[in-house]
Swiss-Prot record:
Primary subcellular site in the record, as a coarse category: virion
TM spans (from-to): 32-52
GO cellular component: host cell; host cell endoplasmic reticulum membrane; host cytoskeleton; membrane; viral envelope; virion membrane
Region (Interaction with host DYNLL1): 141-153
Coiled coil (UniProt feature): none
Protein name: Inner membrane protein p54
Family, as annotated: Belongs to the asfivirus envelope protein p54 family.
Species the sequence originates in: African swine fever virus (isolate Pig/Kenya/KEN-50/1950)
Length: 175
């Protein structure tokens, strides 16, 4: 065995061992580690606050898909005013003829005021008010007996015309 590996190591000056030295404090020895830990904790807290705030926003706003959006067409009767009906079909109550911009003046008398606004007039009719209960006489309307080939080839559009609310896909399919 080599004897040089087993030789005791002595301090150069015996006074170094005997001098009173204070041990450094925990904060001074681990200051860098503590600062890094504080910065990491602050970053984690900021990320958690951001994640929870975005979840609350998503939960508060209902998830609306394209199929759930309904479009209400206030000019439902008026947009088809130029098209002539098919023979054998009758005009729905409250439908206009060719007077798109003119108010309907020959309505049945009701206790509700006439607004000349198609949106509110249709809402009054849809809620089952007095206007919906008393249907106008058939003498007020004249039906045209001309042949309309375009409406014969589009039964889906005709079905949409009868409804008051439309989905996004219905509108795409009708175009």
């Amino acid at each position: 065995m080599d004897s040089e590996f087993f030789q005791p190591v002595y301090p150069r000056h015996y006074g170094e061992c005997l001098s009173p030295t204070s041990t450094p404090s925990f904060f001074s020895t681990h200051m860098c580690t503590i600062l890094v830990a504080i910065v990491v904790l602050i970053i984690i807290i900021i990320v958690l606050i951001y994640l929870f705030s975005s979840r609350k926003k998503k939960a508060a706003a209902p998830a609306i898909e394209e199929e759930d959006i309904q479009f209400i067409n206030p000019y439902q009767d008026q947009q088809w005013a130029g098209a002539t009906p098919q023979p054998g079909t009758s005009k729905p109550a409250g439908a206009t003829t060719g007077n798109v911009g003119k108010p309907i003046t020959d309505r049945p008398a009701t206790d509700r005021p006439v607004t000349n606004n198609p949106v509110t007039d249709r809402l009054i009719m849809a809620t089952g008010g007095p206007a919906a209960a008393s249907a106008p006489s058939a003498e007020l309307y004249t039906t045209a007996t001309t042949q309309n080939t375009a409406s014969q080839t589009m039964p889906a559009v005709e079905a949409l015309r009868q409804r008051s609310t439309y989905t996004h896909k219905d509108l795409e399919n009708s175009l």
